[in-house]
UniProtKB/Swiss-Prot annotation:
Organism domain of life: Eukaryota
Temperature note: Optimum temperature is 37 degrees Celsius. Less active at 25 degrees Celsius.
Propeptide segment residues: 134-139
Biological function: Scorpion venom phospholipase A2 (PLA2) that is lethal to crickets and crustaceae. Causes inflammation in mice and lysis of human erythrocytes. Has a mild anticoagulant effect on human platelets. PLA2 catalyzes the calcium-dependent hydrolysis of the 2-acyl groups in 3-sn-phosphoglycerides.
Family indicated by similarity: Belongs to the phospholipase A2 family. Group III subfamily.
Gene Ontology molecular function: calcium ion binding; calcium-dependent phospholipase A2 activity; toxin activity
Active site: 59, 88
Details of cofactor binding: Binds 1 Ca(2+) ion.
Designated name of the protein: Phospholipase A2 phaiodactylipin
Amino acid sequence: MVKRVSKEEMDALERSCSQPFEEERFLIVSGTKWCGNNNIAANYSDLGFLEADKCCRDHDHCDHIASGETKYGLENKGLFTILNCDCDEAFDHCLKEISNNVTTDIRQKGGAENVWRFYFQWYNANCYRLYCKDEKSARDEACTNQYAVVKKNFTVQ
């Protein structure tokens, strides 16, 4: 599968990849501190000027299974962290709320739309769903034996 990217996206990727290996590599969306492959925030309340940064911060703090980690009986053998599908759904909703708000500034709308496109169309990460082995709801605190099942990717509407 081939993905088309803009010149700006390619330039940003090129700059990131050309940094020396000793340096931390950050690909952070301009105007944010949380939207990217890491964060540059000083603390939890440190946000960039784009409203999408709140969505990214919340998404970064979601339940996840890191590469090489086993959790809920699921081993993540992939190169990238996978998140709970509920988190991806909340992230999708948060970004769309910003871009669909008629009173939102055009820069804010564009920022949210760019983050959405990158994550849901270009990156298109897998996610996982939690289930309970004893027929209780996975959201029920009494469920002590949750297990995870990978969903190939979050399907947006």
